[in-house]
Amino acid sequence: MTKSHPLNLAGEPRAFFGRRSGKRLHKGQDQLFRDVLPALTIALPERGTLDLAALFPGARNFILEIGYGGGEHLARQALSHPETGFIGAEVFSGGIAKLVQQIDAEGIGNVRLFTDDALKLLVKLEPATLDAVYLLYPDPWPKTRHHKRWCRVLGQGSG
């Protein structure tokens, strides 16, 4: 596996089309990356699956948002539903910085972040552990063959 060609679920190289960085982070964002982001970042276990209950003690539901951009939707949902554990998966450093800034400023405690390819996260989740997945502005647009990836981790009746 190389950085430019991560592996897909079948172990074959696949292309990544999103940007990982844009303009340079300003001093305040850089400090948030150093001081705040590490506590929010999800570290995947080498073996086994990710324990969402341990990440979010007391949470009744778990929701994943993939490609959250600036994080406006994710932050609003997290503030509106404090009983839910939210995972945001994003690779773009500008979007990550913007959301971390908002999490820090508003004291949002029910959000954890994954800052790599969401596919790596999906394969570490137990089947039927998520109550919903938000994919609001997909790039590239999802294809029918991608459906099996979401169905495996969504609980029955989830949407």
Specify the residue positions occupied by each region the protein language model found:
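Conserved SAM/SAH-binding beta-strand->alpha-helix loop
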Residues: F92
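S-adenosyl-L-methionine
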Residues: M1-L64, E72-L79, V100-P127
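A short glycine-rich, Lys/Arg-flanked "PGG" loop and its adjoining helix->strand segment in the class I
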Residues: C151-G159
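Short beta-strand element of Class I
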Residues: T84-I87
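Conserved beta-strand/loop positions that form the S-adenosyl-L-methionine
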Residues: I66, A89
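A short SAM/SAH-binding and catalytic strip from SAM-dependent methyltransferases
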Residues: L130-W150
